[in-house]
Structures are given as structure tokens and as C-alpha cells.
Regions:
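Extended catalytic cores of very large enzyme megasubunits
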Residues: 1-299
Length: 299
């Protein structure tokens, strides 16, 4: 079964031997030591069985599979195996579960953003479905979309960001990430967005319209230094349209901050991302190119 699931796979093991040889890439063999299983806890072993091991694969075989697949040569593969089997370092979930196989991707996290159009929203949904199905954790930025009640087309008005996030919640939950885990994603909104007050309570199970909740998504608020100064000085805070910057609502910065902290205390979220500090720390060549960080990821 293992041969069928791995590309160019050859497994040579004797049941009576503790030292075995696993070959994933042609010419790259890894010597395994099953006595190192004792370094794993019982909980760790059960987790590996449930989510990571391939059919007929043992714990050390998993480490060897990953080491062989991602190595440059036999010596490199053996070193990687030795480090993993001794627990000196451990790859991420997609690498352990998908490395050396034709399933999923070796990447944990993906970031994207929705544009302020129906086409852009549909593109984001479609992309997130495929990413979740391949085992990726997703972070999506929704700050480009106009808030509820803003003009759309000739005479229409938008229903806001939250209904589209709710659809993303349902789509992500519906997609199974192989046999490892369900789809998982986070969505981000800036502190100046017109819907930030409702967005803060996105995961709160009580109060408000249940059709405007997304209980399975994680969510984060992108906070600026200007907002924190407004909180410090007890000033007004302006919620603005992402489309043209027009002020949609004026609130007290401290009231919004207290609401945010209260929700975090009661529900554990939303995440707080202090975006100006993040962008101060990005590499200079990215700054010179005019690049900026807008959001963070799922974890």
C-alpha cells in the first residue's frame, strides 16, 4: 500500500530488525532506528496514527519519508531524519503528512484578500475552497469591501461584509482537509472599517442576527497607531468607507477599544494585529518597493 501512495517509493525492511532502510527518492536511503519510538509520548503516538501516518507506515518510517523527500542527497536525508527522530526539530503538519506523497501541499498557511466586487468575492471563495481542500490554513483580508448600506451600482445598497464572510464560514467548514482536519480560516478587518463593531462580535453565539454570525471562523482586527493614540487621548474615531474614505460613523475610540477587549475576554478573539509595528519591521527592500503587510494568518 505504501508503494502505491508514494512516488518512486521503495521500502526495504525486515520485521526482525530494529534498524531499517527507507527509500523515497531514487538513490537516497535513510537508516531508521525504531528504538527511538520510546521518545514519543503515548498521546503523540496516537496523534500520529490518527492524522499523519500513511497506511502500513510506522513512526520512524514517517520521519524517513519526509527526510528523504526534502533532502538534497543521502547524507542530507540521514541528518534530517536523525534530527527529527531525536525531536531536535519537527516539520509542520503539511510536511509531515504530505511529504513524499501525491496528496495535499507542503504549505501550512495562505493569505489572500477580497476585492470590492462580486467577481472579486467569488474568486476569493473559490480560491479558499481549493486551498482548504489541499490542507491549507487560510487568512483572508476583507477590508476592501464597502460597509453595510453603502451605494452599489445605480440604486442598490450593499449588505456589507459580514454576509460574505458567513458564506466563507460555511464553505470552509464543508471542505475536509484529507483525513487530517476540517477546513480552517481567519478573516481580518481594519479598525476603521464601517462594520468593525459588528465584526468584533462575529463569533459571539448570542445577541444580534444569527444570519450575520460566523461561529467557525477565526477573526482579527488590524489596529493602527492612530487608533491607539485616539484611545489614549479619549478622542473620536472615524469609521470610513474603503471605497472613497468618506466618514460613515463617528464613535469614541475608548468605547470601541473596551468593546474589543471585552469580547476578547469573553470569547478569546478577535486577534489583535498592530499593523504599523509590523510594517516598521519588514525588510528595507520591501519598503523601497512600496510593499506593505495588510493582515496576518490563521495561527
Amino acid at each position: 500500500m505504501l508503494k502505491k501512495l508514494l512516488h518512486n517509493t521503495k521500502v526495504d525492511r525486515k520485521s526482525s530488525d530494529i534498524l531499517n532502510v527507507v527509500q523515497i527518492k531514487p538513490g537516497i536511503k535513510v537508516k531508521t532506528d525504531e528504538s527511538k519510538d520510546t521518545l514519543l509520548t503515548e498521546f503523540g503516538k496516537e496523534t500520529l496514527k490518527d492524522r499523519y501516518l500513511l497506511p502500513d507506515e510506522n513512526y520512524q518510517g514517517m520521519f524517513a519519508r519526509v527526510a528523504s523527500y526534502f533532502s538534497e542527497d543521502a547524507n542530507h536525508a540521514q541528518r534530517l531524519y536523525d534530527y527529527m527522530s531525536k525531536h531536535w526539530f519537527m516539520p509542520s503538519t503539511p510536511i509531515l503528512s504530505n511529504g513524499g506523497t501525491n496528496r495535499g501541499l507542503p504549505i501550512s498557511c495562505f493569505l489572500n484578500e477580497a476585492n470590492d466586487s462580486l467577481h472579486g468575492i467569488l474568486e476569493l471563495w473559490n480560491e479558499n475552497v481549493w486551498l482548504a481542500s489541499k490542507g491549507g490554513g487560510i487568512g483572508s483580508y476583507w477590508g476592501n469591501l464597502r460597509g453595510i448600506g453603502e451605494k452599489v451600482g445605480q440604486a442598490g445598497k450593499t449588505s456589507g461584509v459580514v454576509p460574505f464572510i458567513r458564506v466563507m464560514d460555511s464553505l470552509t467548514l464543508a471542505i475536509s482537509q484529507g483525513s487530517l482536519r476540517r477546513g480552517s480560516a481567519a478573516c481580518y478587518l481594519p479598525i476603521w472599517h464601517p462594520e468593525v463593531e459588528e465584526f468584533i462580535d462575529l463569533r459571539r453565539p448570542t445577541g444580534g442576527d444569527p444570519n450575520r454570525k460566523a461561529l467557525n471562523l477565526h477573526h482579527g482586527i488590524v489596529i493602527t497607531d492612530d487608533f491607539m493614540r485616539a484611545v489614549e487621548d479619549d478622542k473620536d474615531w472615524f469609521l470610513k468607507s474603503p471605497k472613497d474614505g468618506a466618514i460613515q460613523k463617528t464613535i469614541k475610540a475608548r468605547s470601541l477599544w473596551i468593546k474589543l477587549l471585552t469580547t476578547r475576554i469573553e470569547t478569546g478573539e478577535p486577534y489583535l494585529l498592530f499593523i504599523d509595528k509590523v510594517n516598521e519591521a519588514i525588510p528595507n527592500h520591501q519598503k523601497l518597493s512600496g510593499l506593505q503587510v495588510k493582515m496576518s494568518n490563521l495561527c
